[in-house]
Swiss-Prot record:
InterPro entries in alphabetical order: Ribosomal_bL27 (IPR001684), Ribosomal_bL27_CS (IPR018261)
Protein name as catalogued: Large ribosomal subunit protein bL27
Organism: Caulobacter sp. (strain K31)
GO molecular function ontology, one term from the record: structural constituent of ribosome
Keyword Transmembrane: no
Family, per entry: Belongs to the bacterial ribosomal protein bL27 family.
Taxonomy, superkingdom: Bacteria
Amino acid sequence: MAHKKSGGSSSNGRDSAGRRLGVKKFGGQKVAAGNIIIRQRGTKFYPGANVGMGKDHTLFALIEGAVAFVTKRNNRTYVNVAAPVAQAAE
C-alpha cells in the first residue's frame, strides 16, 4: 500500500551541538605554554613565532607571553606569542 509521508516532523527534528570553535585568547592577552589560542576547522589562522598547531588545526602557545595577530602580504593571518620582557631588579 502506497502511503505518502506528510510533514516530515519526525524525520527532520534533530541538530548537532555547536563545536565551540573560535578565538580563545585575543591579541594582547597573556598566555602560558600549552594554552589554546584558537580552535578552528582548517587553517583560517596560521601558526607564527612560538605557536604550535595540532592535528585538528588548533593553535596553541609554546611559551609564556602575549598573543599578537599579524596579517602578512599574502593575506594570511599569523598568530605569534611574544616573550614577556624581563623586569630589571632594582
